[in-house]
Amino acid sequence: MPAAPTEKETARASAAKAKAQSWPYFAAAPAQPPNVLYKALGEPENWRISGSFRPRVEGIANQFRPVPTFAANDILNSYLTTLYVEYGIKGPVRLGVELFDSRGYFQQRNSSAFTTEINALEPGQAYLNFDTGDLGGDGSKSSLTVGRFTKNIGSRRLVSRQQFRNTINAYTGLTYDWQGANRDKFTALWVMPHTRLPDDVNGLLDNGIEFDRESLNLQLFGASYTFADILGGTFELYGYGLYEQDSGTGLRSVQTRDRRLFTPGMRLARRPQVGAFDYDFEAIYQTGLARETAAATDLRDLTVSAYFVHAEVGYTLDHAWKPRLSLHYDHASGDRNNDGKFTRFDTLFGARRFEYGPTGLYGPVQRANLISPSIRAEITPSKVWDAFVAYRPLWLESATDTFAATLIRDRSGRSGTFAGHQIEGRLRYWIIPNEMILDTGLAYLAKGDFLRNAPNAPDTGDTFYGYLNTTLFF
């Protein structure tokens, strides 16, 4: 019979348990949804009903994109409303529907605000979810979802449901999710990603209502397996296929780069914990065929060979404010001229705000033609608020390709590879815990030689950007 623990050992174990439970203890979504609408409807049995409303104001000065193609200075007042209803939550089959309403006002006619910000009144989710129980073994749980749905997988760098952006990726198809008794996870999916509509200037300015389109001309499929408890964290292996083709030549046709890609990758990650190191290492390769442009006359298939690497190491101090300092490195391949290959990395349907700064009217940095280390400092003083600041210098991986998401390019390569410095900060504060949260941030882009001297670089100064939004959960 084992000896009973001493008083000192018991105290030490209790302290360790409290420390483990104290991280993370800030969340940008309600820990307990207020269910205001559900309660107002009389709390109907077997239903789940919730929603959110997020107004945002943002502005950009000294545009980094080509001018006058895009406005040199711009503002956007956007609204994102969601309404989620699910029936059958106590049974083996659940029916779910979620409406998205993403609108924008007061932007310039040549604003960079596009379908990433505006998509009025869209049934983003409409699905059946089947509980398949312990199909994968004793102690496991699994489910099959069919219809329209949103999806987060792994790091969210390739497949995601956006959190900051004003519109949300959605897919039509099916997905199977499994979790074993040992906490291993498996996901497989075949989907048709939605093309958001309208996508013309007048339709966007009018917040026109037009249902999004899915078709066999754009398909995403693949699987991910995550091993639990590997080196104190998780290890994920995955592979995704993307098939894309033009949808004809008529008035409503969509011309594409005819991407036929296979994207395998791996990720080793450990979540932040107080008084410990954490890490996130991910390596992705991309192969297949694609065309250089979406022009209908471009019929030349290029061999794709692209890659992306992310490395991150952080440490959280055992202090009341839970300060975390982390070092990051991102390397995404860019394309070269006239080599018969296409080597620019494609992040598929991944999110980027959590790593590279605000998107919306801003968002110069993405996983394409990028070399960028970064340092980040975060604090989490309480469950009510958190904040961070980050510094990131920016280089091009290829001097002849477009830099990240800026649309700035020098095919000659004479503008160099240094794009500039980015400094950003963010503050989040629960005005009413679990019901209303404030989120505000600033970003400063000090332009380097490339963003100043490239042939289509705008004659503007350094870029300033700011936003303020509140989200009400009901």
Enumerate the language-model features and the residues they cover:
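Conserved C-terminal beta-signal and adjacent last beta-strands/turns
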Residues: 127, 375, 388-389, 418-431, ...
